[in-house]
Amino acid sequence: GLDDESLRAAVDRAYEDEWDRWRRVLLVVPDGTRRHSKAGFLACHLYRRLPHCRVDVLEALGTHAPMSRETCAQLYPDIPFDRFIAHDWRQDVVRLGEVPAGFVAEVSQGRMERPVPVEVNRLLLSDYDRILSIGQVVPHEVAGMANHAKNLFVGCGGAGTINATHMLGALCDMERVMGREDTPVRRVFDEALRRFLPSVPVSWLLSVTTARGDDVTVHGLFLSDGREGFRRAAALAQEKNVIFVDRPLTRAVVHLDEREFQSAWLGNKAVYRTRMAMADGGELIILAPGVARFGEDAQADRLIRRYGYAGRDAVLRLCDRHEDLR
């Protein structure tokens, strides 16, 4: 893997000709659910290299709960807590437009035929000299692979974008999505980026890692202003983060780190990330010592408690009958 000095040197080479000209910089960083991403190390290095800049740190939370002072200190020890801004997916967003229904229908092969609203945190439209989006490319149940434009449109997105793209991913079947670079949701993100944020000065710092406990190995770091870095990172993540089994598993035990997983909403990744390996009729045992609620926020928690987890077809019928699910 890459050692810390190699990572620092790569970042310095990528931006050393630019950062003397920067005065306002926005770091877009992951929350505690990505503690093995090496994002904390990278963000702290950037913060130290930019003493002449005003640096704001936007937490790409999506619908997740904001990071506590303690979590920020653990993950980003060199960055003062007052520099962090917790993204609020309900209040902090501006609507830019929508990805047309025709495009959505085409990429989903007709599974979804409605437009996707495009809403992002208003800070992404502020007068920053550079936005540095930092995170890990890893298999994801909605987008196929996490990060790149997803970090802006979901991590820093609004309810309309998050809800529509998650529904699109569900309608397209997780088995066709998980671990793939080219998916219907990814194509929607790419189109939204092309249509609505073509001139935003964003650069991507994308890691591919594996971990045993808290021992993180960085297999690759991809720095780019376009999509090529993501494409290469996704290929490496498929190699490092997807495990193929010789035969289906009849029993599996998953332990959810209590520092990362405090809700069933997040803990369901234990299901998403094992289901293609499980035998029909197999047993999945989930040890979740930190899970204390269903949803990441109060409204989502209420809806899950009211309607439960019922499978795709049943949920679609519920959506037809109940306004609060639309």
Which residues fall in each region the model found?
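Short glycine-rich or small-residue beta-strand-to-loop segments that form or flank ligand, phosphate
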Residues: 24-35, 58-62, 133, 253-255
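Long, charge-dense
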Residues: 56-105, 308-326
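Conserved, well-structured core segments that form the ligand-binding/active-site neighborhood
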Residues: 86, 90-245, 276
